[in-house]
Amino acid sequence: METKKKGFPTAFWTCAATEIFERLSYYLGRSLILIFATATVATGGLGLSDTVAANMQSNLTAFSYLLPLFGGIVVDRYIGAKYTTPVGMMIAGVGYYMGSVATTATGVYAMIFLVSLGLALFKNGPIIGRVITEKEQMDPAFAMRYTLVNVGAFIGTFLVGILYKDVFAKDGVLGFAPCFKIAALIMFLGACWYFFVCWRFLGDVGKRPFKKTKTQE
């Protein structure tokens, strides 16, 4: 007799869907930095050199991978990932909004710092690893998670060119500010999704720092 394949729990799907919000806004914002920084002031950009703009984009990439080490310490020892994840999304959302009002390189660097800090606290992956209780489901679950990550990344990268050049461009001014605001809005919506939807299904998962939870077990 064939054993019926068990599906993923609802907590997995709600948490995994959060990845779409985060990656969509990240790739929308990241793709825009280089173009925004090098575009002329007359077209709504900052008029910076290609070198400075490339450094900005590289800094966002680097810090968004380095600062999560700090975030890992936080969720391991001090605050549960269930709380840091929506807070991190809100902080990143504020960062993208800073990009929408930036008129100097300093404003962009402020955006980079806040976005990187927010992503450092975004610890959705470890939570997903804990809502999956069946060992044989772990690999398929993370494969599905990365599929949703790629969906968000693709949509963000695809939309950015259409939005800033066609949808929001007006009278020769490109739509950089509205695009950054959309990235911010997506993160705020993602935080709301996490708080009002994911929390209903997570139960005690991620409420306590992971190290304390492991010690109790």
Model-derived features with residue positions:
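A gly/Pro-rich, aromatic-decorated transmembrane alpha-helix motif that marks the paired
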Residues: 31, 70, 151-167
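Short amphipathic helix-loop junctions that connect adjacent transmembrane helices
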Residues: 31-54, 165
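Central cavity-lining transmembrane alpha-helices of secondary-active solute carriers
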Residues: 55-76, 154-156
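Cytoplasmic membrane-interface "Motif A"-like loop-to-helix N-cap segments
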Residues: 77-89
